[in-house]
């Protein structure tokens, strides 16, 4: 077998392969022998069909089967021998496939780029340092109390954290518009569900009042006919309710688990959960900065086939999240996922090189610690640890995560890392 490799464009390669006629003829003969033992033709016993009838009836399909075997086999033999790191599936084009002649074909495929890491010392990473305060825990307790709150009707004016029941009719230039009308609409004030100015226009009014609110739809509003338009809403305020928070008693805290018997227990449990969430958020924030730096310092082309595979993964994940079926999945435009898919392939290649160049292997002790951390969020942590330890697929997933963390650490060791004091809210609610 002779081999000729050609670079076409970018990461695309074309390989011309010649398979000697002796190999081809032998493969054809063996396939005919196999067929002769198994084909059924009326009027003949199995295994006794004359060769010329087999040729007439099945010759073309037999040769196609031979071709289907020879093409990938000799292609992969060739690329393995040449140590070519292929991406995706090759496409084949037959040049010659005739009796008594060599099989000549070409395979077009993509390769993964050769990655040589550079510029790690130029990567800048800001590493937040955060201390969870008693005030942070107080805020979390307030959230829990609000989740258990009841509502009491009020005759006072509307405040920012009340619940109101209203009728409203919206109009633009004196004309009502679709979706701008509701009856007995329950609105939780302060949650920002409505367009800017709507909730603010209700604050200070009393139940039974009728009044107008002037607002302007945002320029990025989803309805094209309302973008940037000035609108008027006629409001009828039917009912105002104040939030009544439960007292912070032992009875209240007992709702949050069998081991939570006092306010002190609740605060300790909240701190533990906040520390776990904070740790994950900090790891994610630092990792994203490392990824951004790696991509910026090491711009690489990626195989289109690998990007396409990743697009399909993202498309399927999106469909599952929204309960779509296979047909709906195929209709989701690839452009929605292309940028993220490209980034994922880049990250995979760059992390692989970090792992390879630093000869990293998953730290088993670190993997055990990660499982213990996951298990601590459950009521029966020992059972969770045992479940992981007996499931090789889950264990491998954990090892992969650990290996990525070790790769991040390897980059951080060479990067420019600065620390910044931050609050819990700044890390957990960056958009707030």
Curated annotation (Swiss-Prot):
Q: Which GO terms describe its biological process?
A: 'de novo' cotranslational protein folding; cell division; chaperone-mediated protein folding; protein transport; protein unfolding
Q: Which UniProt keywords apply?
A: Cell cycle, Cell division, Chaperone, Cytoplasm, Isomerase, Rotamase
Molecular-function GO term, any one: peptidyl-prolyl cis-trans isomerase activity
Pfam family of the protein (one): Trigger_N
Q: What class of enzyme is it?
A: isomerase
Q: Which HAMAP family match?
A: Trigger_factor_Tig
The protein's name in its UniProt record = Trigger factor
Underlying gene: tig
């Amino acid at each position: 077998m002779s081999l000729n490799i050609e670079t076409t464009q970018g990461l695309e390669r074309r390989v011309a392969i010649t398979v000697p006629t002796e190999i081809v003829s032998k493969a054809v003969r063996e396939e005919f022998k196999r067929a002769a033992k198994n084909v059924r033709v009326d009027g003949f016993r199995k295994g006794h069909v004359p060769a010329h009838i087999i040729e007439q009836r099945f010759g073309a399909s037999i040769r196609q089967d031979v071709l289907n075997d020879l093409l990938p086999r000799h292609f992969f033999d060739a690329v393995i021998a040449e140590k070519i790191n292929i991406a995706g599936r090759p496409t084949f084009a037959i040049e010659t496939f005739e009796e008594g002649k060599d099989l000549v074909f070409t395979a077009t495929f993509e390769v993964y780029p050769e990655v040589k890491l550079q510029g790690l010392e130029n990567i800048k990473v800001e590493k937040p340092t955060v201390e969870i305060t008693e005030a942070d825990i107080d805020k979390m307790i307030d959230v829990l109390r609000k989740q258990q709150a009841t509502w009491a009707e009020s005759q006072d004016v509307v405040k920012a954290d009340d619940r109101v029941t209203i009728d409203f009719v919206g109009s633009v230039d004196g004309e009502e518009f679709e979706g701008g009308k509701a009856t007995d609409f329950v609105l939780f004030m302060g949650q920002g569900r409505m367009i800017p100015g709507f909730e603010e226009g209700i604050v200070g009014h009393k139940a039974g009042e009728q009044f107008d609110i002037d607002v302007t739809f945002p320029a990025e509003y989803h309805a094209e006919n309302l973008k940037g338009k000035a609108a008027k809403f006629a409001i009828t305020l039917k009912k105002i309710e104040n939030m009544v928070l439960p007292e912070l008693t032992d009875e209240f805290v007992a709702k949050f688990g069998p081991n939570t018997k006092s306010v002190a227990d609740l605060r300790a449990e909240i701190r533990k959960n906040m520390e776990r969430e904070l740790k994950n958020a900090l790891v994610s924030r630092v990792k994203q900065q490392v990824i951004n730096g790696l991509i910026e310092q090491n711009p690489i082309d990626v195989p289109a086939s690998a990007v396409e595979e990743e697009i399909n993964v993202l498309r399927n994940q999106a469909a599952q999240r929204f309960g779509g079926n296979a047909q709906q999945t195929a209709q989701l435009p690839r452009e929605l996922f292309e940028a993220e898919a490209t980034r994922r392939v880049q990250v995979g290649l760059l992390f692989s090189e970090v792992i390879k160049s630093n000869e990293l292997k998953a730290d088993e002790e670190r993997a055990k610690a990660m499982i213990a951390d996951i298990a601590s969020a459950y009521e029966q942590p020992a059972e969770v640890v045992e479940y992981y330890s007996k499931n090789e697929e889950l264990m491998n997933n954990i090892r992969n995560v650990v290996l990525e963390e070790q790769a991040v650490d390897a980059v951080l060791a060479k990067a420019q890392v600065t620390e910044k004091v931050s609050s819990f809210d700044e890390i957990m609610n960056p958009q707030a």
